[in-house]
Amino acid sequence: MSFTVAVKEEILGQHHLSWHELSAIIKMSGSIGLSTSGLTLSVVTENAKLARHLYESFLHLYEIKSEIRHHQRSNLRKNRVYTVFTDEKVQDLLSDLHLADSFFGLETGIDEAILSDEEAGRAYLCGAFLANGSIRDPESGKYQLEISSVYLDHAQGIASLLQQFLLDAKVLERKKGAVTYLQRAEDIMDFLIVIGAMQARDDFERVKILRETRNDLNRANNAETANIARTVSASMKTINNISKIKDIMGLENLPVDLQEVAQLRIQHPDYSIQQLADSLSTPLTKSGVNHRLRKINKIADEL
């Protein structure tokens, strides 16, 4: 099950029926038709549970009977598509939800009453996500929430609603409509709180924390590996210089304070500067050992 499906199933499992949620779903997935008996309404979805939710919303909120039809999509995905269809009191339904325009179509914007009411806004965002929302799986590490709209002004209305909840929503116009999106993980988690998907929010945060912990460990390991590589490289340079001194002038001719450091470096090429400092008969600071190693390298360079 994808993360998007899990979020939608959590919302639908709460069995909340809302006029504003229904308004968003119809606005984003509905179409109006005309029959001999008047207007018809069809709402299309690939989610069987959402189709059932719509059926119950029509029945309990408006006492409208509808039917759920389905067919198999013929493209590569071959998903089953559900259509919730009704020809009962469609005009009354659209008028009550402030959805109908004067040309027997659906209004493209969002009603001002929804934009100005927090609870109505929550319900509308919930419906918008159920209809056309998606969240990239947090396991991917690339966080993105999208809500697709047919009309640009509707996408901008969705962005306005999200911004009222202090979410950094942006709108991108595409060839077929527009998309409202969030890209920050914190914004996506807050959105899940807004629509009441608390379990999904907790799951998202858990995955995010695990990923960040793994990344921190990897960075620490990479840094440690790089430090080891630098230590070995510096050690080998010094060892080569000590060998050069030994062959040309003999280590016994080095100043006494350098002889012990030179011997230790040859015996323990993998030691860090701190380990060398701790191993001297008279322990030194790291800077003290570094100073002596630089002296040894300088002597070798002058030979």
UniProtKB/Swiss-Prot annotation:
InterPro entries: Homing_endonucl, Sporu_reg_WhiA_N_dom, Sporulation_regulator_WhiA, Sporulation_regulator_WhiA_C, WhiA_LAGLIDADG_dom. One of its GO terms (molecular function) is DNA binding. The keyword DNA-binding applies. The gene is whiA. Belongs to the WhiA family. Residues 272-303 bind DNA. This is Probable cell division protein WhiA. Involved in cell division and chromosome segregation.
